[in-house]
Amino acid sequence: MNITELMELFSNPETIKTLETGDLMTGIGVTVVLGMGITVVALIFLMYIIGGMAAIMAEKPKEVKETAAAAPKPEAAAAPAPAANNDEELVAVIAAAVAAQLGTSASNLIIRNVTRSLDTTPAWGRAGIVDQMATRL
């Protein structure tokens, strides 16, 4: 029995029961290989489509044209004066938040140093934290 006839017999559930063990195992193997083969080919096809789309959508480096007249170099800007004022406000806000958390007055606290810590939480983690704070508290 060739594979085409065997697959025709596999299309009817009643005829599967009449097959010999060897033919049944051959049909099962052909079905599995055919199914996996089609899946692998489809995934490879999708891989190439996605790769092509990524190549099309990728930003191309912009070419900078040199002009004959050199643009004047910007001078270094002076540091803004209100920065010290913002630091004092930041310390006041942090002191108020800590005092509120501890249930005491801000005048009872002594803040010696305020340093920024690096946030290594991924974007999805920050989104989860915001979601929990918004919906569960």
Swiss-Prot record:
Primary localisation category: membrane
A single Gene Ontology CC term: plasma membrane
Alphabetically ordered keywords of this record: Cell membrane, Ion transport, Membrane, Sodium, Sodium transport, Translocase, Transmembrane, Transmembrane helix, Transport
Record InterPro entries: Na_pump_deCOase
Reaction(s) the record says it catalyses: (S)-methylmalonyl-CoA + Na(+)(in) + H(+)(out) = propanoyl-CoA + Na(+)(out) + CO2
GO BP field: sodium ion export across plasma membrane
Top EC class of this enzyme: translocase
Function: Subunit of the sodium ion pump methylmalonyl-CoA decarboxylase, which converts the chemical energy of a decarboxylation reaction into an electrochemical gradient of Na(+) ions across the cytoplasmic membrane, thereby creating a sodium ion motive force that is used for ATP synthesis. The delta subunit is required for catalytic activity as well as for the proper assembly of the individual subunits to an enzyme complex.
Name of this chain's protein: Methylmalonyl-CoA decarboxylase subunit delta
Organism: Propionigenium modestum
